[in-house]
């Protein structure tokens, strides 16, 4: 090139710039959002009434517990009206969108309770629900089954089957829970089912030998993700795995990230006495990835750098 002539930089095509931006954006989404999980919880809230939740210390703790979960299944809600749940939703709504779905009051005596789903309505929606038709009256509180959407292409929906057993009939009710699974999986053609709640499946209510003979233990495909021996009770004097989560279906297994109890007294620095005002149970929870376990974050970082160098 003759000296003295101006040198103009080569113009990068718009399509090239757009492609580079798309690659970077896609990888950043995977890198930042890949670890985001969807949390499903179950909590025996121990005779939950409006009188109980309007106590400030109880309400604050309950709201913090509920706010951790994308779907929470509450048990032992004994309020015949909707006031208790509406009060909790009012406190939750300050930062996020929530809705709820509840069963009727259930029970054989004057004592009755209901199942209540509280869920993030900006992240999931109810597709279907029904009260299991317990024609033989096996359950004291028959499951209130619901199907929810999930933010996952691998598993677009999941079925939740909550159960709070009565201690004297634990084995009978848990074996009948297998029939509920068959009913719902055939009804909605969906075998990705999570059974969860206060099963009373330990200690004096169910000996280990009887536990291992349950249909949900002997039939293939069921995974008890809260391990035996995990204490789900608040009192220091007890050590029982009453509360459980049982998962079925390949989609659930592919997306499973973690399952655990939530020790809310330790997290919120409560004494045992303070915690017992909320409940004598810990919540149990399962986390589902939005995509199947794939590229680890450190590999995504490397892939991002390589892509930038190739496009640069």
UniProtKB/Swiss-Prot annotation:
Q: Look up the signal peptide feature and give its range.
A: 1-35
Spell out where the chain is glycosylated. Answer: 102, 133, 239
The EC number of this protein is 3.1.21.-
Keywords, comma-separated and alphabetical:
Disulfide bond, Endonuclease, Endoplasmic reticulum, Glycoprotein, Hydrolase, Nuclease, Signal
Q: Which SUPFAM superfamilies match?
A: DNase I-like
Task: Look up the domain of life of the source.
Answer: Eukaryota
Write out the catalytic residues in the record.
113, 164
Per the record, the GO terms for biological process are: DNA catabolic process
Location in the cell reads: Endoplasmic reticulum
Which top EC class applies here? hydrolase
- Give one Pfam family: Exo_endo_phos
Molecular function as annotated in GO? deoxyribonuclease I activity; DNA binding
Key word Glycosyltransferase present in the record?
no
Disulfide bond entries? 203-240
Q: Which SMART domains match?
A: DNaseIc
GO CC, alphabetical: endoplasmic reticulum; nucleus
State the family named in the UniProt similarity comment for this chain. Belongs to the DNase I family.
Q: What is this protein called?
A: Deoxyribonuclease-1-like 1
- Which taxonomic lineage is given here? Eukaryota, Metazoa, Chordata, Craniata, Vertebrata
